[in-house]
Amino acid sequence: MFPFARLLIAGACAMSLPVALAPTVAQAAPHATIAQTQALLDKAVAELKAEGPGKAFAAFNDANGAYKTRELYVFVFDAKGVYEASGANPRLVGTNAIDMTDAEGKPLVREMIAVAQRKGQGRVDYIWLNRADNRVEHKRSLVQQVGDHIVGVGYYAG
C-alpha cells in the first residue's frame, strides 16, 4: 500500500473516532411502552386500594418515588376534574383541570373521566407537548376508576 493511502486511511479513521465514541446522552431515550404504562397503572390502582387515598396520593406525588419513571407518572382526578395527585407536578393537586384541552382543543380530562366512568377503564388519545424534547406528540393515557377517583398513566405513543 502506498504511504499516502495509509495516511489517508489513518486520517479517516482518526476523524471518525470521536463520532463513534460520542456519548449517547444526546439521543432521545426511547418512549415507554404500553406494557410499562399498564404495569404502573396496575401498581397504582393496587396501592390506592390497599393503602387508601392519603398514603397512595402521597406516594404518587413523590417525584423520586416508585410511581415516577422517565416519562411515566401517575395522576389522579376526582369526578369533577380536580387533581388529587400528579407525579409530574404535585403543585397541581387541588386545581381543577376539567376544562384542560390538548394541542388540538380536545377536552382530555372530560374524556378521561367519561371513559373511566362509562367503562371502568380505558384509554384516551391526545396531542401533548413532550417536555423532554419540546415536541408536540401523540400521547395516550390509560385510565381506571377506583371508587370516586380516576387514576391514570400516560405515555408518548409516537
Regions picked out by a protein language model, each given a short descriptive name:
Residues 2-4, 11-158:
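N-terminal membrane-sensor/transducer module of prokaryotic signaling receptors
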